[in-house]
């Protein structure tokens, strides 16, 4: 599956335990997203457009109104990266 660099960075942060917090307007449409890694730092590559592409490809999912997490399809699509921890 073709995954762009910003999508790849976002998926990698989610695969390590991060989440995507979302904010809705009065009509229920998602208007703003913030991607956090497992340490609580904000990832700037995660924009509303990246969020929409990941959601349309079903690489992320949310259940019961909780923050978005990586799905099993997302785990298979993410390429391994070196972790400099």
From Swiss-Prot:
Record Pfam families: YjhX_toxin
InterPro entries noted in UniProt: YjhX_toxin (IPR018654)
Source taxon at top rank: Bacteria
Family label: Belongs to the UPF0386 family.
Full protein name: UPF0386 protein PSPA7_4799
Organism: Pseudomonas paraeruginosa (strain DSM 24068 / PA7)
